[in-house]
Curated annotation (Swiss-Prot):
Record protein name field: Probable oligoribonuclease
Disulfide bonds listed in the record: none
NCBIfam families: PRK05359.1
Species, as recorded: Dictyostelium discoideum (Social amoeba)
GO biological process: RNA metabolic process
Entry EC no(s): 3.1.15.-
Residues of the Exonuclease domain: 19-181
Keyword DNA-binding among UniProt keywords: no
Length: 190
């Protein structure tokens, strides 16, 4: 009997091993009322090398939507400049989904590559709600760096967590998440 692992992928090739890194900034975390403000995307290979940094889009929202953000978002999105960028943006949610879908289709095949990021299950919920066609392009599995962080704190408390700036802008958060996973790869998964 063979001990070679089997995979559910139709073809295992370099393209099928890619990771689709996404980060969203939202008006809050309440899926029933909050919305996406910013989305960035980066494609990496299995070794965490960046293949291409994709669009980093700020979606226009009304002042009414911005006024109803929770206190944390009002403070942090105000400090980061995101609130003002949202006011000035000309990009609709529909346009943003179309642009992101074109980008991800250029680099991945439908249903093959996982969504990656930090606490990315939250991003996935908002993608399913607001950008379902984009979300459906991705595999149902996710690579969540925050899971590794939490397990490392418990199982390897002597290994320091990588330092992060936490600027709360989408592209910067993705870049930090990729670096964080690289760090865990050499310290925890050695």
């Amino acid at each position: 009997m063979s001990t070679t692992p089997t995979y559910n992928h139709p073809v295992i090739n370099e393209r099928s091993k890619r990771m689709v890194w996404v980060d969203l900034e939202m008006t809050g975390l309440d899926i029933s009322k909050d919305v996406i403000l910013e989305m960035a995307i980066v494609i990496t290979d299995a070794e965490l090398n960046v293949i291409e940094k994709g669009p980093n889009l700020v979606i226009h929202r009304s002042d009414e939507v911005l006024k109803n953000m929770n206190d944390w978002c009002i403070e942090h999105h105000g400090k980061s400049g995101l609130t003002e960028d949202v006011r000035n943006s000309k990009i609709s949610l529909e346009e943003a989904e179309k642009i992101m879908l074109e980008f991800v289709r250029k680099h991945t095949d439908k249903g093959i590559c996982p969504l990656a990021g930090n606490t990315v299950h939250e991003d996935r919920r908002f993608l399913l709600k607001e950008m379902p066609t984009f979300a459906e392009h991705l595999h149902y599995r996710i690579i969540d760096v925050s899971t590794i962080k939490e397990l490392s704190r418990r199982w390897y408390p002597y290994i320091p967590s990588p330092k992060k700036v936490c600027g709360h802008r989408a592209l910067q958060d993705i870049e930090e998440s990729i670096e964080e996973l690289k760090s865990y790869r050499v310290t925890v998964f050695k």
